[in-house]
């Protein structure tokens, strides 16, 4: 089926009042980037919807990109025809023949913004319905919740016909809620938290801590490749690799075992906050879920959050692990997240970490270390890599090795 355009309907943009124009402009830019491999298309954002003129581009390939763009509620592949009855009949029949299957029910739903058109909505519904019955077999009408709705929109410039209502990613266009940093590990939770942050319109920079030689290049490559999967939903993401070896070694050497995780997380949060400030971010996101591990009890969060006044947001805070896994599978990060490359959160994990660390004790222990100089050395050693949708960093040999573990 050769469609002429795609009609895109906005989601929460309709509630944004005076900022609506800016939100629509951002969405148009995000759609343009997502479809940059199709130079023939034209994108026309309007107040109530967006028209993507295909000019011969295949809808099935456009569909694969469009469904990942946040800010789109629904969209429909559409045929645009001249404002005459024969053209409407022909396009309606083509659409129904391409999508109708035996046993399906349907109805015709006409809307007019051009009230000067010669036929009203009831007349068009009846005439097109009769024409379809005369030219197709096994049609059944159902007025409430049919399988197919043939939508005919009579506008000033033309008539638009569609019979599919496809669901988009919802949410807000990435970039409309400002910039933040995401503390990305190689696990299941933080990629899901990243997805949810972007869905609310946040443009994120990934901050990943690595500790060579305890963590391998493969672990770093895994985190980058996870970022490449997430970039499908936002376009390019900056990946910031922060060396963490010295800090971890000093903590392990000089501090009691029970507080290793607490102090380590305090350093991570301080580093993330410094990077946020340098890059103009407004918040810090992470993948913590309340009570899931020792560092994610409320007492631990109090002892760790003490190092910053910046908002620390946790999109998966109240989700069960099974809920997080289900979403990870849906967004395409789960299989890579469970590849067994150790990250810096696991290499020095004590057997009995404090689940209720005391804030005063955490402060006192951290003061035994030369925190400021170590933080600055880590900042000086960080590396920023732009990562693009589906960019690969793990070679086939690395994947084979992981499968054997």
Swiss-Prot record:
Keyword Protein transport applies: no
Family that this chain belongs to: Belongs to the ThiI family.
Keywords: ATP-binding, Cytoplasm, Nucleotide-binding, RNA-binding, Thiamine biosynthesis, Transferase, tRNA-binding
EC number: 2.8.1.4
Alphabetical list of NCBIfam families matching this protein: tRNA uracil 4-sulfurtransferase ThiI
Start and end residues of each THUMP domain: 60-165
Function: Catalyzes the ATP-dependent transfer of a sulfur to tRNA to produce 4-thiouridine in position 8 of tRNAs, which functions as a near-UV photosensor. Also catalyzes the transfer of sulfur to the sulfur carrier protein ThiS, forming ThiS-thiocarboxylate. This is a step in the synthesis of thiazole, in the thiamine biosynthesis pathway. The sulfur is donated as persulfide by IscS.
Subcellular location: Cytoplasm
Annotated catalysed reactions: [ThiI sulfur-carrier protein]-S-sulfanyl-L-cysteine + a uridine in tRNA + 2 reduced [2Fe-2S]-[ferredoxin] + ATP + H(+) = [ThiI sulfur-carrier protein]-L-cysteine + a 4-thiouridine in tRNA + 2 oxidized [2Fe-2S]-[ferredoxin] + AMP + diphosphate; [ThiS sulfur-carrier protein]-C-terminal Gly-Gly-AMP + S-sulfanyl-L-cysteinyl-[cysteine desulfurase] + AH2 = [ThiS sulfur-carrier protein]-C-terminal-Gly-aminoethanethioate + L-cysteinyl-[cysteine desulfurase] + A + AMP + 2 H(+)
Pfam families recorded: ThiI, ThiI_fer, THUMP
Annotated CDD domains: PPase_ThiI, THUMP_ThiI
UniProt-recorded Gene Ontology molecular function terms: ATP binding; CCA tRNA nucleotidyltransferase activity; tRNA binding; tRNA-uracil-4 sulfurtransferase activity
Domain of life according to the entry: Bacteria
GO cellular component: cytosol
Example GO BP: tRNA 4-thiouridine biosynthesis
Residues that coordinate or bind ATP: 183-184, 208-209, 265, 287, 296
Protein name: Probable tRNA sulfurtransferase
Enzyme class: transferase
Pathway listed: Cofactor biosynthesis; thiamine diphosphate biosynthesis
Primary localization: cytoplasm
